[in-house]
Curated annotation (Swiss-Prot):
Keywords: Cytoplasm. Required for morphogenesis under gluconeogenic growth conditions. This is Putative gluconeogenesis factor. NCBIfam families: CofD_related (TIGR01826). It comes from Salmonella typhimurium (strain LT2 / SGSC1412 / ATCC 700720). Belongs to the gluconeogenesis factor family. GO terms for cellular component: cytoplasm. One of its GO terms (biological process) is regulation of cell shape.
Amino acid sequence: MRNRTLADLDRVVALGGGHGLGRVLSSLSSLGSRLTGIVTTTDNGGSTGRIRRSEGGIAWGDMRNCLNQLITEPSVASAMFEYRFGGNGELSGHNLGNLMLKALDHLSVRPLEAINLIRNLLKVDAQLIPMSELPVDLMAIDDQGHEIYGEVNIDQLATPPQEIMLTPNVPATREAVQAINDADLILIGPGSFYTSLMPCLLLDELAQALRRTPAPMVYIGNLGRELSLPAASLTLVDKLAMMEQYIGKKVIDAVVVGPRVDVSAVNDRLVIQEVLEASDIPYRHDRQLLHNALEKALQALG
């Protein structure tokens, strides 16, 4: 009997945020509706942060990034969704996609309904689910014991925080929990470690689902050095240990990383180490190379 391929899987789930999750989803977009992204909603910077401070609600920026990278049919709607205002006025720097998502959120019963409306408008087949449908922020305790509030401030810490948490305590989106329960393969990363990857793992229901799932789990490492000082100081082993500390169990079966990553201390896990860089932007994953590496990981995991 041949090993399974990605095309054989009924449910592939990827967790994270920022440009990293969008890149993973776009590399697997051939899976269509069998692909689900669980998206971080704690961003408090840029256009997203301004909207949250003014209007409240969840952070839409990471969701917009994922939708942008999943658009395969250019249209007036997609051009509008990707448009960013210039100039010096009140709208300067705002992304119209963020405003569209926020407007639909006001018109919908749930944020997930707003996302599905936009998915249909943009003809995006992959499922996208916010990690929580309630407003939440990332908080850290620094090495002096001080509370540091928000992703922007946490990324500016000089050293790794003692602890990270979500505030307030919010429930995970029930569809996100169900997606993990039903998954045949789970992917985490790439992305900014503290602010894109960890928030999903800090939700109790998602961590519990990750502890219980029998699905193989793969961590995809970054290709470039993190701009966040505290995250940049972490080794691959540090990151694996921290993720599993918050999940509560050793669950990551494989890592997919570039050739410059030190994997010498990674034990008892499958390591797929290959050239993954895109030719135009070296710190981004080439979609086909990433797809091939994930295929290789799945084959090796059996």
